[in-house]
Amino acid sequence: MNTKRSEEIFGAAKNLMPGGVSSPVRAFKSVEGDPIVFDRVKGPYAWDVDGNRYIDYVGSWGPAICGHAHPEVIAALQETLEKGTSFGAPCVLENQLAEMVIDAVPSVEMVRFVNSGTEACMAVLRLMRAFTGRDKVIKFEGCYHGHADMFLVKAGSGVATLGLPDSPGVPRSTTANTLTAPYNDLEAVKELFAENPDAISGVILEPVVGNAGFITPEPGFLEGLREVTQENGALLVFDEVMTGFRISYGGAQERFGVTPDLTTMGKVIGGGLPVGAYGGRKEIMSMVSPSGPMYQAGTLSGNPLAMTAGIKTLELLKQEGTYEKLEALTKKLLDGILTAAKESNIPIYGQSISAMFGFYLCEGPVRNFEEAKSSDTELFSKIHRLMLQKGVYLAPSAFEAGFTSLAHSEDDINATIKAFQEIFSEIS
């Protein structure tokens, strides 16, 4: 496979941007290679600057649930573009997307739009503290809530990719109020509440962990968190930046039947444009400025282009049979991967929910980040390189979830499974 042009562009980029990229995982450092440089995307496919085509299971890290450059999304964007790219003022599109989010997500009675998932999580932490009058927060090992200082504690994902326990430049004082527990360990959470009476503002988590690979909640875990937070006068926050509108129309909270107090969102609700949001009970959200004293603002928040792409994407997702199709397609893909590995005697453990999936190169089960780290990352790096040569683009990290889309066909899934079969057979 010829990647000469990608190599040239990335070589130049390293003199222009730190590591040659705008986000660390894109550098392919954890898979011991140089990144491919994309030229265009369409449907389930991505083409690099050398003309190679890939079946894409990264989907711009989650937003492309309808497939890249969906014609209806593009048409809607072109219409809005004629009216301007940014108003810096209220527009009716904000109302429309807000109504759709409120109708869909059980916990959300009011919503505030921002520009990224990181920004949403930063704001929601401030809101948790403002509403409760408490400073401490509990997060889980391997759960990633963006690159804000107070969340870069045992954060999985990009931090794990770099092999760092946390990040230099984050003062201890900044994270002193961030408490951590193993994911799926309810007793550890109860112990933290017992050790810090009337001091914990709330618990924030990815209800399905997509930034430590793909880890699902054990039966009773989410329900237990809901109970223990209520008992202690603390808030429960679901970070649904990744799972929102992806594992069901109403997100993980609809899927599992557990309603948090607050929710952060991003990715899908922007249809491929920069976006984030946080929302929850009206009683809590009324504290956000200008209604209340908790300040948060943004120059491009509620950008008309992002609102337009989000509205059209949610309209497409609301069509009958959408999530049944995604569930079946993703299950077929994962089952094929697991079967192919087992036929070649390669240890593997994996799971899928709707349009998300992940696998670990170990026996499993994987219930938390510590168990996830037993996955064979060197073997994953080799598989990643070989899959690229077969025309399949997987996330360039052993600790990232994979994504399917409505644009993926049975033929795409079959071709991907065949590529895995050939590679597993070759390396076994």
Curated annotation (Swiss-Prot):
Pfam families to which the protein is assigned, alphabetical: Aminotran_3
UniProt-listed GO biological process terms: chlorophyll biosynthetic process; protoporphyrinogen IX biosynthetic process
Pathway(s) where this gene product acts: Porphyrin-containing compound metabolism; protoporphyrin-IX biosynthesis; 5-aminolevulinate from L-glutamyl-tRNA(Glu): step 2/2; Porphyrin-containing compound metabolism; chlorophyll biosynthesis
Gene3D superfamilies membership: Aspartate Aminotransferase, domain 1, Type I PLP-dependent aspartate aminotransferase-like (Major domain)
Catalytic reaction list: (S)-4-amino-5-oxopentanoate = 5-aminolevulinate
EC number, UniProt record: 5.4.3.8
PROSITE patterns: AA_TRANSFER_CLASS_3
Family of this protein: Belongs to the class-III pyridoxal-phosphate-dependent aminotransferase family. HemL subfamily.
Protein name: Glutamate-1-semialdehyde 2,1-aminomutase
Organism from which the protein derives: Prochlorococcus marinus (strain NATL1A)
